[in-house]
Amino acid sequence: MQKAIVLGGYGLIGAASMRALRRAGFAVTGIGRSASAALQSDPSADWLIRDIPAITVDEWRTLLAGVDVVVNASGALQDGARDDLTAIHVTALSRLTQAAAGLPLRIVQISAAGVSPEASTAFFRSKAQGDAILCASALDWVVLRPTLVLSPDAYGGTALLRGASALPLLMPRIMPEAQVQTVYIDDLAEAVVAAAQGELPSHLICDLTEREARPFPELLQIIRRWQGWPAPRLHLRLPTPLITALGKAADILGHLGWRSPLRSTALRALQDGITGTPDAWEDAGGRPCRSLAQTLALLPATRQERLFARSYFALPLAIATLALFWIFSGLITLFDPARAMAILSVRDVPNWTTNLSVFGGAVAHLGLGFAILWRRWTRAAALGMLALSGAYLTGSLIVAPDLWADPLGPMLKVFPGMTLGLMVWLMMEGR
């Protein structure tokens, strides 16, 4: 049985490649740095949990022993808290190439349509640099460059596409000049298998894409109709400065661990157009990739598809709401602690308890409000908010039960916030 390893095996393309290779009879091992993401992607697969850019040449030589095919589906969109483009796209591939020298294996590189040393984004430039290192080697290699990959799994840009298409009543209109082509995930996975089985010639570089391109707003409309939503009442043109500001804000959040598809790299890539030419693929004997209409016909818009699309923006909205509430409630208390202390002092609570409750609570509010914005601590912060809210409810029953009968309902209003925190805790997961 031939052996294959897939780098980035729990990503959108990596996971599909692993499944397709197994069906084709390969013994497949996936490599990635997150054990939880690997198990969520495929709990029955063989996994090697490693940070790919940290693997040395000597370690690669050990890992490549007996391997027939390496599929490199690892990558990152933009530098951030967890990602380094040069490390993952250039350094890792350079080490892999050095280690594979002289070995009887094939490397299948998953790149991207449009990569170029002169591209407008670091993503495409670093991808091109990695491709060049592989192509300059004497190894047996194939480079596949897909356009926008559509899949049953909502992931990154295609998740945003689903969410934006499902907005109630309105349809955002952005970048009307941007042209987009798509490729079905199964077409890409079949190409990986064909390359792994030696059905494609060595040193082939080809785009994987449908032939037809369309403006991005038209793609949004097509996805909306596919999801089964009524036509929008309003087409809202988003000005370029607003889109730029959203990209900059998403870049900042990227340093807090959020891999938003709204980051400036994705927006610039969309503005440049996501297009390719399938001629090299078809000339090499590849089956023409499915059109967008054929792809969507194979992806029925189920109830869970529509539910995901409608709730896509709910999670970031909930996190932002909780962050603002907890941060500002902490600041307000610190700016006017006397009013907060009066609530306890009039009920004969000892001064030391009052001071600790007011100032300690304010600091806790600030800490939780900022922590929920840091992706690594979001779930823990949501649990902290639930715990502190529960402590407030319990304390009020002991110290100030009259607040429960207050016409403004200060204690009853705690429950919606707790529900929002619980929702964030439940919905958060790794990519």
Predicted regions and their residues:
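N-terminal Rossmann NAD(P)H-binding glycine-rich loop of SDR-like oxidoreductase domains
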Residues: 4-24
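Mid/C-terminal beta-alpha module of Rossmann-like enzyme folds, strongest
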Residues: 195-262, 273-315
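Conserved beta-loop-beta element that borders a ligand/cofactor-binding pocket
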Residues: 132-153
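N-terminal Rossmann-fold cofactor-binding loop
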Residues: 30-36, 53-54
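NAD(P)H-binding glycine-rich loop region in Rossmannoid oxidoreductase-like domains
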Residues: 45-95, 99-101, 113-117
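A conserved pocket-lining segment of Rossmann-fold NAD(P)-dependent short-chain dehydrogenase/reductase
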Residues: 163-183, 187, 191-195, 199-202, ...
